[in-house]
Amino acid sequence: MHCLVTSTSIKLTAPSDTIDVQYCSDYFEKNNKQKPKINLPKLPVGLAELRALVKGGFKANDLKLQHVLAYLGHLLQDIKGELTEDWTSFGVLIGNRSHNITPLDLLDVNYYDDKLLDGVKANDASQSDDAWMLFACLGIYRLARTQNLQHRSSILMKMNAQILSLNQNAIKLVDNTMFYNSWISNYNYTKLIAACDMFFYKFKDHEHAVCRFGTIPSRWKDCGGLTSLSHLKNLTGMELEEIVSWVFVPSIGKEICRMMKSGQELDKPDSYVPYMMDLGLSMKSPYSSSANGGTYTWIHMIGSIMHSQRSLHARMVNENELPNIRISAMLTAYVKFNKGSLMKVFVKEEDKHLYIGEDQDENEGNGSDYIDLTQHPNTDSADDWYQWLEINNFTLDDIIKDSITRECKKIQNTRAGTIGSYIQTTLS
């Protein structure tokens, strides 16, 4: 650019501190397809004494993470599942068909000698305590990740109910933010959590699968952009191909292309990829809400207008291109809220010949051959509506605006800093 005042030419630049996203596949390529590494303390005591220290820690509300890691390192060796097929992910062989594996087999475990920290021992600890203490030790992860005090209290109440169902003589868990909140910053603890959830997701009928109550937030952690696509798919009934056809904002298109990079096992349920963050496979998720702020905001604006509670509570993480994203979201929500895609599903047996061979979807969801661009399209086709929007200079008419306003006025009690609050205050 040239400045007329100073008669100089300048190059316009803006500061940037963004970190490139890291894909799961890159980790395994750089590490010769080795399992994620974890370091666990090797203490000069056996399982019985560790069990006593963990139970004593629960009693005294002074549980040491070192004791928990060593205890889980022992206990998880006896939690096994038999594979019905070879289990591989990113070229890593996790286990062979018909073999028994444990959660630790998902990791490359390094045991290191460590000095035993002092702790309170419970003299009445026994093997019967293992089930509830395993649940509690893993459940602390979910508790620690919950910052909202009301929700945290609810989680704790549910945890204690489950603990008592596992053992009526179990010790009720007491929240200790000073200790527990620091646990989720310990890479070895979070790697154990991820390995356990990945194992119990694979073996859904395992007797200890109930432990997923505490570990489930590890699955798809920091993948809010990607999981929001699934949310919109479920909310609207649209397939992903149709969803992306409604993307009219170029920056959102770039985000979706980046998320859909091939070779990442996104469609493989038992892959390492849902646990990439807690397993330390990526420093910055390519699927997070912050890395895909436009997509995340667009989807949850649509969801908020359609009164989805999940969308209403979604955090407002993006302020870039808000005018374009808002217009695009309003149009998509209007069409999908007011135009259904219905078909005849059941008929009487004697009438089925009237329907067999009939192409019921002949005109459903497809662009029409001709539309009057001065009127709203009579289809729910993204192509038709984009043509209408383009011919109207990308401006929504009063019919659409009034319809959206009526819906947004029904929204109540949103939390500050959420997309629901933004929709309520700007569109109602």
Swiss-Prot record:
SUPFAM superfamilies registered for this protein in UniProt: Rhabdovirus nucleoprotein-like
Keyword annotations of the record: Capsid protein, Helical capsid protein, Host cytoplasm, Ribonucleoprotein, RNA-binding, Viral nucleoprotein, Viral RNA replication, Virion
Domain of life: Viruses
GO cellular component: helical viral capsid; host cell cytoplasm; ribonucleoprotein complex; viral nucleocapsid
Record flagged with keyword Kinase: no
Location relative to the cell: Virion; Host cytoplasm
Database matches in InterPro entries: Rhabdo_ncapsid, Rhabdovirus_ncapsid_C, Rhabdovirus_ncapsid_N, Rhabdovirus_nucleoprotein-like
Role played: Encapsidates the genome, protecting it from nucleases. The encapsidated genomic RNA is termed the NC and serves as template for transcription and replication. Nucleocapsid assembly is concomitant with replication, therefore viral replication depends on the intracellular concentration of free N, termed N(0). All replicative products are resistant to nucleases.
Quaternary structure note: Homomultimerizes to form the nucleocapsid. Binds to viral genomic RNA. N in nucleocapsid binds the P protein and thereby positions the polymerase on the template. Interaction of N(0) with the P protein prevents the uncontrolled aggregation of N(0).
Protein name: Nucleoprotein
Chain's gene name: N
